[in-house]
Amino acid sequence: MSDTTLAKSFEPQTIESQWGPEWEKRGYATPALDPSRPDFSIQLPPPNVTGTLHMGHAFNQTIMDGLVRYHRMLGHNTLWVPGTDHAGIATQIVVERQLDAQGVSRHDLGREKFVERVWEWKERSGSTITGQVRRIGASPDWSREYFTMNDKMSEAVREVFVRLYEQGLIYRGKRLVNWDPVLLTAVSDLEVVSEEENGHLWHIRYPLADGSGHLSVATTRPETMLGDVAVMVHPEDERYRHLVGRHVKLPLCEREIPIIADDYVDREFGTGVVKVTPAHDFNDYQVGLRHALAPIEILTLDAKINDNAPAAYRGLDRFDARKAIVDELDAQGLLESVKPHKLMVPRGDRTGVVIEPMLTDQWFVAMTKPAPQGTFHPGKSITEVSLEVVRRGEIKFVPENWTTTYYQWLENIQDWCISRQLWWGHQIPAWYGENGEIFVARNEEDARAQAAAKGYTGALKRDDDVLDTWFSSALVPFSSLGWPNETPEMKHFLPSSVLVTGFDIIFFWVARMVMMTTHFTGKVPFGTVYVHGLVRDAEGQKMSKSKGNTLDPIDIVDGIGLDALVAKRTTGLMNPRQAATIEKKTRKEFPDGIPAFGTDALRFTMASMATLGRNVNFDLARCEGYRNFCNKLWNATRFVLMNCEGHDCGFDKPEVCGAGDCGPGGYLDFSPADRWIVSLMQRVEADIAKGFADYRFDNIANAIYKFVWDEYCDWYLELAKVQIQNGTSEQQRATRRTLLRVLETVLRLAHPIIPFITEALWQKVAPLAGRYPAGKAEGEASLMVQAYPVAEPKKLDEACEQWAAELKAVVDACRNLRGEMNLSPATKVPLLAAGDAAQLQAFAPYVQALARLSEVRVLPDEAALDADAHGAPIAIVGGNKLVLKVEIDVAAERERLSKEIARLEGEIVKCNAKLGNEAFVAKAPPAVVAQEQKRLAEFQSTLTKLGAQLARLPA
């Protein structure tokens, strides 16, 4: 193999397009089920089939793929199951918009035809996100890919629903739910975004029924007063205690309602008197239950006033009704005041419409009802079991503080509304008789058999509703492994090893997986939950379409032009008026668009930012730095190949380093530099193993970066050049062997984080390093399934580490002297040195090369050095004294130093004036003040050095 076999520059797309499909074709991700090996498995949180990859996905999958590749290389039975979620609401909206563009509604098509259209769209577009997952280098077992609506997953969903119903843990009832009046469906809390908005607080007079006065009631939603069933005060509020039990007249309605007392009331809010509307407020609903107040619904499902309200308001939209009601209250003298008020407004994340609490018939899972006999945990509720397994340590949260959040949510849990008024999703397996009879069954045939057994022979109609998407997602830990069948995968990979997830879905997905898995399998779904932060922009702002700060990870990988980026950010905005602002911001931030960084640079960036529990403020500048790292690694490999190909690299003897083989006169004569880099490698390997164990991907990335860039490239390669040029054949052989073996180990170490570049380079390096599998031609083996490096303490060599530290200190001192004397890199001058003569002689060839010196002259003592220095700057390193012998014009040098000293003194005066100005320190951003303080310190340090130089010049 010649040195031209490795391209001159790193071209990510070429490598990615070759190796991504190749890994998949070879089936490396399919696990062996070897009972003698440890098992490692992980679930890919199924992305929406409608979706495209976002930065959160890219971050999450970098972490998961890093773990999977690491354990696969450790030789574990490793399974990563991929899948996509049918995403009920999101998918239905996409297809309905397509129909709207054709002037057709789903009701025009009918349910069956509409669902067919959704399946057609899924088949056309569903592979978009899985293709993007592949582009990020993810290596799950694609042969096991599932879709939450496929036959096997649907069977598991029906089985779970039927069993829970038979166990009395699923029921149908009328309860208050989040209702989207545009989509006309219940929605989960996760699909509701509450943000602070400017509103009003209306103070309304409710006359006492006996005519003796009135109560002033504060409300932010006057339209719902039509459904009031009481007004409420705090039981200890002296202002109103005497009125409890009496009645007020409900304005605009011909009803009297009671005055009740409840601890829920905040005496400091408004007047301390609030209205109670159980049918349209979650807190009021609980108050209504406590006080046995029958709710009165006053809104239709599309948020218009219904027939329970006075005739004047019927049919009005809720916000039109608000205006009409306020106007009428004002006309009747019942509107006391209107004040500006900030409040949290819940909006549907898909429609942007204000969500209404609505009383509707829905299906629920009982969260706190004890499970019956015959289940894995009889007498305990699914919530109770979910708390116990975490308290017992069967599931651990990383970072641990998320355990408290998990407890708080489960300890205050409400029954789970699992029905949705949609057409796309798992249709609820319940059939109704003509008189409201309910038959829950796995299929219609079973439902008819149930009905017949109960003496019902009439028509059956299936429930129109579908299940909450989170219901099927909660089953994934076991449904994706073949449940309800007992499969080998269930035995090996349940519980899975770790779940990697953002904190935003601990409640909606994580806890529900724990509930369902413990209830149906008796096992926990996973042993560890690694909770990471959210990916935000460089300023820490949440990435959102409306802010115009989103980044597409594929655009970072492939690059994108400015105009295309602007178009992507300004198309499909919920508020098109934001387009101009977003375009201006984008053109300023990315004047040349986004260059192609490649997958490895993106993954390295994500890993480096994965600190425990913190949000990730993604900065493209960091991405550029890691692309530079990839280039550095590529160029270092080219150097190693060019210096090792066709040479004796010390692999002719299969077994070396026996007695006398690895020292002076042996087959390999390893230098202290060779032993130092190998010793340091052991420490890095140990640090990386700890990083994986602790889920500290930032530490893993930093350890790889610092070792490769700061130690191997910046130091060892330079030392190796000297050894190859000046060493004996045994020393050259040892150096080449070390160059190759350390580089090959680096490629294996870094592979879980940067898989593509490491694979491409390993194909070239491993054969030379004697690490390519026997009998395999180049390209036939893969780094993906090689053994992961493990630290060998016996290779630690503290003496050589100390040797390297002292050599570095001498080289750095020489470089600093060159800087002080303004010597150009091309100017080579002699170094005079005195001190530890043996050490200095050993260091001499390295120092001469690395510090760009013409020679290194070791003098017998300091007196000889001082006599020869002629006032030149001196550096002291340990017991060694160093001086660069440069013939200088003393008068000219004195003048130059004096001018520079005067300039620095002037700069110091300016800095002190700024920092002494209280207004500047108080008003300037902290970063600006810190920068000024840093400038002052640098000026003072340089001034001290120049003063010492001036003092050393001969008179």
From Swiss-Prot:
Q: Could you confirm whether the keyword Coiled coil appears in this record?
A: yes
Per the Swiss-Prot or TrEMBL annotation, the motif 'HIGH' region is positioned at 47-57
Annotated GO molecular function terms are:
aminoacyl-tRNA deacylase activity; ATP binding; valine-tRNA ligase activity
A biological process (GO) annotation for this entry? valyl-tRNA aminoacylation
Q: Where in this protein would one find the motif 'KMSKS' region, according to its record?
A: 542-546
Q: Which UniProt keywords apply?
A: Aminoacyl-tRNA synthetase, ATP-binding, Coiled coil, Cytoplasm, Ligase, Nucleotide-binding, Protein biosynthesis
Give binding positions for ATP.
Answer: 545
Query: What subcellular locations does the record give?
Result: Cytoplasm
Q: Which InterPro entries match?
A: aa-tRNA-synth_I_CS, aa-tRNA-synth_Ia, Anticodon_Ia_Val, M/V/L/I-tRNA-synth_anticd-bd, Rossmann-like_a/b/a_fold, tRNA-bd_arm, tRNAsynth_Ia_anticodon-bd, Val-tRNA_synth_C_sf
Q: What is its EC number?
A: 6.1.1.9
The UniProt family comment states: Belongs to the class-I aminoacyl-tRNA synthetase family. ValS type 1 subfamily.
Say what the protein does.
Catalyzes the attachment of valine to tRNA(Val). As ValRS can inadvertently accommodate and process structurally similar amino acids such as threonine, to avoid such errors, it has a 'posttransfer' editing activity that hydrolyzes mischarged Thr-tRNA(Val) in a tRNA-dependent manner.
Free-text domain note: ValRS has two distinct active sites: one for aminoacylation and one for editing. The misactivated threonine is translocated from the active site to the editing site.
Protein name per Swiss-Prot or TrEMBL:
Valine--tRNA ligase
Q: Give the gene symbol.
A: valS
